[in-house]
Amino acid sequence: MTSSPLSPHPDQPADASHQARTADASHPPAPPVDASHPAHLVHTAAALRDLPRGTGVRAVVMTMGALHEGHATLIRAARRRVGPAGQVVVTVFVNPLQFGAGEDLDRYPRTLDADVELAAAAGADVVFAPSVDEVYPGGEPQIRIAAGPMGALLEGASRPGHFDGVLTVVAKLLHLTAPDLAFYGQKDAQQLAVITRMAADLNFPVEIVGVPTVREDDGLALSSRNRYLSGPERCTALALSAALFAARDRLAAEEALRARAASVGHHPAPDRAAALAALGEDRAAADAHAVAYAAAGALHGPAVARAAALAVLDDAARLDPPLTLDYLALVDPSDFTEVPDAYEGEAILAVAAKVGSTRLIDNIRLVFGAGRPEATAAHQGGTTTDAVDTGDTGDTADTATSAAAASSPSAPSPSAPSVTSTPPATPPTTPQGPLGATR
């Protein structure tokens, strides 16, 4: 990707950076959508072209069906952004090109009637549900779009050819739907990144709007594949989000220790204990040791975050049923390469694992060096966060004791995110990025 998917607010003017826009979840929800008029269901590109487009802009939400609240959040965000004069198109297409050998193409849920109902209730004007022959006339295309080096990492390494299939169908659906805006969930962070890069490199005149991950009350990221999980498997699957939250909280604890070390200074041990006592600490000696450790630079954000997440995942591997880890990676959002231990700035902590026969993915966005002025400014400037997690860097711990407690793998259950209420959009004047198929 030319630039990070962690990017400015969707209300900012379009520019030539090709950055994925992100919905800000800090605004109150918009009024309920009037679903008295059902969405038009069309199956061909010709039928879609024949529908009146109106005077506003068109937004598209690309899905593979089996719609759930995560998809509804995308549709509502699109509805709010385009306003009453705009048009929201939801595509429902299970793309065979992005399934590898032995994957779940045949059993992938297909619930079109329910999908149309949910889409209409969330604010969609049109549901475009083409057949495989409509999208790929004459069979699988001989020419496909290659995802390049970024598409060979993580998900691409585990599922060879997956992102080539994603990019090929996204390009075709963008041509068929001709949107001005495209909305995509941040749960599939690598997919969002490769599609944004494709849009930048190939000059698609579409603006991406990234929408924060939607989670269940217990933290599990919403996915169409969650329905495959049995009760015990679902309990094990909670380790994915728990691992991410543990890394977030441990990072916050480390930053608190570093800030305290800076405030106490490099005094001899007795003076340090006295300084901590003056701050109101009850356990001055223990805290002095922890602060001295932080001041010496022994803690490193990326290494500590990885270790905290791995501890949770290692425990989950011993559950019944067990979690089988595919990867845990802390990556630079611009190219999805692993970040070094000295890294400062925004990063994505991504995890993929199997529980039973179901493969699940999740991610969280972290800021390393959050207490430093330059990192804080970047984090507050509209960059992406996982809205469910009320601040991925976590709250600053008040004491070294609470900092240690924050390294526990347990984390509070996140609340459901709100979706930005944004004013009607105008068509972008410069090429932006498109939106990919929602998994």
Feature map (PLM): residue ranges:
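Generic C-terminus detector
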Residues: I348-A406, A416-R439
